[in-house]
Structure formats: structure tokens, C-alpha cells
């Protein structure tokens, strides 16, 4: 199985399965001399880890990270940084009933026909459990970008199902389990998720990610445009079905006289481009939105086939998120950081 590495200079290779003994990653290309401890990485993993509220999966993983290499006396050496996260709360028995079935909307069917042999426990390699390793790697990138460039990344839930959230205060985002920027809508979100659980169903979401303090000039033309890399990175996240940069699909209805970001001696008058022109950062905030599908792991019975091609009914057991968009926030932040870190190193390598 290939396709487990992301990046050009700052690279991340993840490994492990949902119900295996551990997951982890190897981060290569981190500059030497940066202070780094497990305690620096842990807060980012804590933001993503499961079982923190009744509104997400009840699988309870501590997600304690171990640094195995690449750090000596509290500083990066420039060598590959190996990170390990133990899996401690697997419940593989929940998946015994579906080991010979293909769950609708999951990768079971495609993994089976591509590889001929799959780990059915929690989706194996296709599980979003893999994203914990991305968040750990992204933490290293975020720490570097903040310390050396004063670059900030912030993500939040923008919409759950048909419930649109009004942005009021970014200081509220990390104070609630929904990463919602409006404390007046928290109860509405809680009631929504409770209703979904009772119905045995799920719902999709929209998440927005901002990067502020991005140096002008990051990104490359043509195939390695910054927005192209961001779209590639975001689409690699489980359940993501759409990506918008700046105005995104709203640009379809806009006139050129409105959409163009006019400039003055003091800067841009708008940011419909989302901080990127010609694939290169303008210095304005980079704005990315992602659409996530509703998880197919629900208790509502559905039609499918088994490995023999016979039609059967399936009910998905296990512990799952009613809305995967909630915990996608720190994952999307991590992918933004990995892209910007990689492009920063690429920019330094070829430009003054």
C-alpha cells in the first residue's frame, strides 16, 4: 500500500490501523535546533482525541505521544522525528458481524477489491484514527511556524447540517466541545446531536480554517500552487467531499468588479481570493473551508452486499461520531500547518 507520505521537504509518513497496537508517524525535514518535547505536542492531540464529550465517539483513547527519535536534550537534531501513539481502547468484537460485509459509504468495498485482504476492525487503515498521527506531526509544524514566523492557524465549525453558525468570538472556539465561535448557539448544537443519536443517524458539516501571518510569496506556480496543495491536503482527510479557497463556489455568482481584490497603498480592500493569487500567498489571511459528509456508521439499518455478492441488511455497531465535522477541526488545522511548513522550506530553498 503506497500513498502514506505527504510533503516535499517537510514530509510526514503515517502508519498504523484503528485497532492495531499503535499508530504513529515519521516527520522528516524539521530544521534542527527547535525546542520540542512531548508536552509541546500533547495539547494539539488533546484537542482531537475521542471520548471527551457525549457529542463525539465514546471510544476513549489517551492519545499520549512518545517521541522516539530526532530530539536530543530537548531540541530537534534535524534527524527524522518518530512519534508513537498507543491504541488502548479498541473493541474489535463490535466489528465481528460485519467482517464479511461492506458497510455502505465506507472504504470496505474498495479496499477489499483493491487489496484482496483488509482489516475490517474499525476500518483498519482507512479509519480516521490515522489522523491522530497527522495532528501530532502538524503540531511540530505549528510550533515552528508560530515561533519563527508568528504565524497563527485557527479552525472552527461553520455549519452542522442545516444549522449555520454565526462567527461572534474566536476566543469561544476552544471553550466548547463543538469548536463553535458563538456561545449562544452551543445548546442548539447539543440538542441537534442528541436528536441524531436518538434517531440512530448522522449529519455532515462545514469547517473553516484560517492562517494569519503567512509570508507573502509562499507557494509555487502551475502544478504546485499553494491553493492546489491545500486542496490536495484537505481532500485527504477522511469524509471531506469538498474544498473552497476564499470565496470558493460563491465566486460563480459574483461579478468581476466585486470579486477582484482591489489594492491601495495600505493593502487589499477585500480577500475573495482567500489569501492566494496565482498559487502564491498574498500576505492576507489564507481562508479554506471544507465540507464533510455524514458518517455512514449509523444504527439505522441499510442495504449492502457481502463478500459473496449476496444482498444483506447491515446495522453498524461500535462507537462513532454523529457529526465527524466536530473533530475534523484540529485535523484540518494540522493539514494547513503541514502545507505551510513545507512551502516555507521550499520557498527558503529557492528565493531570498
Swiss-Prot record:
Residue intervals passing through the bilayer: none
Listed GO biological process terms: amino acid biosynthetic process; aromatic amino acid family biosynthetic process; chorismate biosynthetic process
Enzyme Commission code(s) on record: 4.2.3.5
Keyword hit for Transport: no
Cofactor binding description: Reduced FMN (FMNH(2)).
Catalysed conversion reaction: 5-O-(1-carboxyvinyl)-3-phosphoshikimate = chorismate + phosphate
Cofactor dependence: FMNH2
SUPFAM superfamilies noted in UniProt: Chorismate synthase, AroC
Residues reported in the UniProt entry to bind NADP(+): 48
Entry keyword DNA damage: no
Keywords from the named record: Amino-acid biosynthesis, Aromatic amino acid biosynthesis, FAD, Flavoprotein, FMN, Lyase, NADP
Record-level Gene Ontology MF annotations: chorismate synthase activity; FMN binding
Cellular component GO terms, alphabetical: cytosol
Pathway linked to the protein: Metabolic intermediate biosynthesis; chorismate biosynthesis; chorismate from D-erythrose 4-phosphate and phosphoenolpyruvate: step 7/7
Stored CDD domains: Chorismate_synthase
Subunit structure: Homotetramer.
Family: Belongs to the chorismate synthase family.
This protein's name: Chorismate synthase
Source species of the chain: Legionella pneumophila (strain Lens)
Record lineage: Bacteria, Pseudomonadati, Pseudomonadota, Gammaproteobacteria, Legionellales
Gene: aroC
Amino acid at each position: 500500500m503506497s500513498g502514506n507520505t505527504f510533503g516535499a521537504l517537510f514530509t510526514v509518513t503515517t502508519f498504523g490501523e484503528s485497532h492495531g497496537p499503535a499508530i504513529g508517524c515519521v516527520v522528516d525535514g524539521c530544521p534542527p535546533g527547535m525546542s520540542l518535547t512531548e508536552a509541546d505536542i500533547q495539547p494539539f492531540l488533546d484537542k482531537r482525541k475521542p471520548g471527551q464529550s457525549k457529542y463525539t465517539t465514546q471510544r476513549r483513547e489517551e492519545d499520549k505521544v512518545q517521541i522516539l527519535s530526532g530530539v536530543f536534550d530537548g531540541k530537534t537534531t534535524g534527524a527524522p522525528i518518530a512519534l508513537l501513539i498507543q491504541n488502548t481502547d479498541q473493541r474489535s468484537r463490535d466489528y465481528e458481524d460485519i467482517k464479511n460485509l461492506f458497510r455502505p459509504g465506507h472504504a470496505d468495498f474498495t479496499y477489499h477489491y483493491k487489496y484482496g485482504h483488509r482489516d475490517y476492525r474499525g476500518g483498519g487503515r482507512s479509519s480516521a484514527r490515522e489522523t491522530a498521527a497527522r495532528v501530532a506531526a502538524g503540531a511540530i509544524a505549528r510550533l515552528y511556524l508560530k515561533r519563527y514566523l508568528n504565524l497563527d492557524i485557527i479552525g472552527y465549525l461553520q455549519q452542522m447540517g442545516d444549522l449555520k453558525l454565526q462567527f461572534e468570538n474566536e476566543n469561544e472556539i476552544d471553550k466548547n466541545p463543538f469548536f463553535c465561535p458563538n456561545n449562544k448557539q452551543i445548546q442548539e448544537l447539543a440538542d441537534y446531536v442528541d436528536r441524531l443519536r436518538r434517531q440512530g443517524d448522522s449529519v455532515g458539516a462545514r469547517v473553516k480554517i484560517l492562517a494569519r501571518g503567512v509570508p507573502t510569496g509562499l507557494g509555487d506556480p502551475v502544478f504546485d500552487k499553494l491553493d492546489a496543495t491545500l486542496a490536495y491536503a484537505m481532500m485527504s482527510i477522511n469524509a471531506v467531499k469538498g474544498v473552497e479557497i476564499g470565496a470558493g463556489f460563491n465566486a460563480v455568482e459574483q461579478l468581476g468588479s466585486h470579486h477582484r481584490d482591489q489594492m491601495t497603498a495600505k493593502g487589499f480592500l477585500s480577500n475573495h481570493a482567500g489569501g492566494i493569487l496565482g498559487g502564491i500567498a498574498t500576505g492576507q489571511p489564507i481562508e479554506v473551508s471544507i465540507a464533510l459528509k455524514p458518517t455512514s456508521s449509523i444504527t439505522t439499518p441499510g442495504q449492502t452486499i457481502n463478500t459473496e455478492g449476496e444482498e444483506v441488511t447491515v446495522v453498524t455497531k461500535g462507537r462513532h461520531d454523529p457529526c465527524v465535522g466536530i473533530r475534523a477541526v484540529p485535523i484540518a488545522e494540522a493539514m494547513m500547518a503541514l502545507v505551510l511548513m513545507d512551502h516555507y522550506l521550499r520557498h527558503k530553498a529557492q528565493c531570498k
